Amino acid sequence: MQEKIKKPTNLHKLVILARKNADFFQDLDRRAYARITKGDQRGELYPLDSSCFENWLSAINFKVHDEVANSKLKLDAREHLEVESRLSGKNYNVGLRVISNEEFIEIDLGDQDWKSVQITKDGWRVRAHKNFFYRNNSIKALPVPCRDKLDDDWVESIFNI
């Protein structure tokens, strides 16, 4: 007797699709995130319980399967991926504009290139993010500091202090 081959469910297809296009982890407060991959560049970071993540799920599902994912499918996929994120053991510090410790301060510039100013006891430099930053809708781009034109009040002007 032949075994019946199970056809993948829409949930299974959406979860597989999401895994191919994002990395999943949780922050130190156990909130699950997706880091959307865009080529070699670190892409946007979405909390799984956000409308941004839900919209992203809709977009990738429509792009690949040419159909709209209903609300229940997106909710089920999100819950599935949240559990996977928590069980994966991947935990990272996620900052909103600033992350720091005893050795450095990193300030997200909020630009499209995902650059930040990294400040250490040895100085500062602009480079790709070293850490994870979440950007809500109120985060706007900061001016990129330039060594040649940097005035002494750059930090004060950025933070309005």
Protein language model regions, located:
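Long, basic/Gly/Ser/Thr-rich N-terminal segments
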Residues: R42-K130
